[in-house]
């Protein structure tokens, strides 16, 4: 079951991140927020995160950074070269699953 981004980070916090106060773009903001969240979840590759409460604060912060990049540069073409968000990757690095699988339950 996929985790809904708005269960992890509120819509109002996403709007604060991009300094947007109106309600006319809520659907678009939610779409980009979910895409940023999914990107960060795939990057970390931690199958132990099953519910919103499992997501560490650093990963939530990274989601906000990636979301802001996606929202600001939402056109397919850009006059400037875009790069991976190094700050977001540093925030997620310690939470990345390098084992390739979930930790087994103790006593199992």
Curated annotation (Swiss-Prot):
Keywords: Viral genome ejection through host cell envelope, Viral long flexible tail ejection system, Viral penetration into host cytoplasm, Virion, Virus entry into host cell. Transmembrane segments: none annotated. CDD domains: gp6_gp15_like. Coiled coil: none annotated. The keyword Membrane does not apply. It comes from the Viruses. It is found in: Virion. Homotridecamer. Interacts with the stopper protein gp7. Interacts with the portal protein; this interaction occurs at the end of the packaging when the terminase complex is replaced by the connector. Belongs to the Caudoviricetes gp6/gp15 head completion protein family. Head completion protein that exhibits an open central channel for viral DNA ejection. Part of the head-tail connector by binding to the portal protein and to the head completion protein gp7. This is Head completion protein gp6. It comes from Enterobacteria phage HK97 (Bacteriophage HK97).
């Amino acid at each position: 079951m996929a985790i809904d981004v708005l269960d992890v980070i509120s819509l109002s916090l996403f709007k604060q991140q991009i300094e947007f106060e109106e309600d006319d773009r809520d659907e678009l903001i939610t779409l980009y927020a979910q895409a940023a969240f999914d990107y960060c979840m795939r990057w970390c590759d931690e199958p132990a995160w099953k519910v919103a409460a499992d997501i560490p604060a650093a990963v939530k912060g990274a989601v906000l950074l990636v979301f802001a990049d996606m929202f600001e540069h939402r056109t397919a073409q850009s006059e400037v070269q875009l790069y991976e968000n190094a700050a977001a990757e540093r925030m997620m690095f310690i939470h990345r699953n390098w084992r390739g699988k979930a930790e087994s339950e103790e006593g199992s």
